[in-house]
UniProtKB/Swiss-Prot annotation:
Catalyses which reaction(s): Endonucleolytic cleavage of RNA, removing 5'-extranucleotides from tRNA precursor
Gene Ontology cellular component list: ribonuclease P complex
Designated name of the protein: Ribonuclease P protein component
Protein family according to the UniProt entry: Belongs to the RnpA family.
Taxonomic lineage of the native organism: Bacteria, Pseudomonadati, Pseudomonadota, Alphaproteobacteria, Rickettsiales
Amino acid sequence: MSITSLKNQKEFELINKLGKKLHERYFILVIATKLPKIFLESKYNTFLGIKVSRKLNKKAVVRNKIKRRIRHLIRIIVSDSSFKDIKFAMIIIPRKGFEEINFSHLNYELSKLILRNI
């Protein structure tokens, strides 16, 4: 399973428009399974965008740590065999409290949301 990031504002806007917004306590997930031609022709199956606002934390070090945690979570979830032939794109927007919650709880919540909506 190969993962790549959303590269520019146009891709983010496209996923925001086509995707379904799902709200959880610690994050917002925008997930799109019906992808435009640009994404379908790609060799990658999963497209990931992460938006970490300055409102969440003023320090760039903390915001980067949050991004690393999210990327690692997605790698774990997508490595599951149930995602083998599915192409989808998602944007994850963490909320306040995301950095304090433990990793296993985040993994459970995020995987539950993704599996339910693919």
